[in-house]
A protein has these predicted regions:
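Terminal helix-turn-helix DNA-binding modules in bacterial transcription factors
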Residues: 37, 41, 46, 69-111, ...
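Core residues of bacterial helix-turn-helix
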Residues: 55-56, 67, 106-107, 118
Length: 141
């Protein structure tokens, strides 16, 4: 779990590097930090933009627009990035896990959404990723 948490923090750092906001102390910068921190801790739960905006006291459209302006990434994609990175760790760490179990443990409620997001973000299906990971481990051993 610590390794996964560390890896997810690296993702967060990469998103921050790509961000184009003037100051982390700006209102939107602080909001962004709060949102990313919350997502990094709760991505396996059912999080919606509406619930997140209510939690932080913002209009959902404003929150969505601010995140996209600061990062170039929409809320749903940011959430999917965290979930897919976690799923990749589950796949490589637990090759016997079924793809559907991996999807559910990563926070996805629908296997189709998981498969589509996984392919969009990695360029391969979860099964292909598992096969490639297994082949890479075999060639190292």
């Amino acid at each position: 779990i610590l390794l996964i948490t560390g890896y997810l923090n690296l993702i967060c750092a990469k998103v921050v590097e790509k961000s184009d906001f003037e100051s982390a102390e700006s209102g939107d910068g602080i909001l962004y930090q709060k949102v990313v921190s919350y997502i990094s801790e709760h991505f396996r739960e059912d999080i919606t933009l509406r619930e997140l905006s209510a939690k932080f006291g913002y209009n959902a459209k404003y929150l969505s627009h601010s995140l996209h302006t600061l990062t170039g990434i929409h809320f749903s994609k940011l959430l999917a990035m965290y979930r897919i990175e976690y799923a990749k760790k589950l796949i490589t760490g637990n090759p016997s896990y079924s793809i559907s179990k991996t999807a559910l443990e990563s926070g996805f409620s629908a296997i189709n959404t998981f498969n589509r997001s996984f392919k969009e973000l990695t360029g391969m299906t979860p099964s292909e990723y598992r096969d490639n990971s297994s082949a890479a481990k075999s060639s190292v051993e």
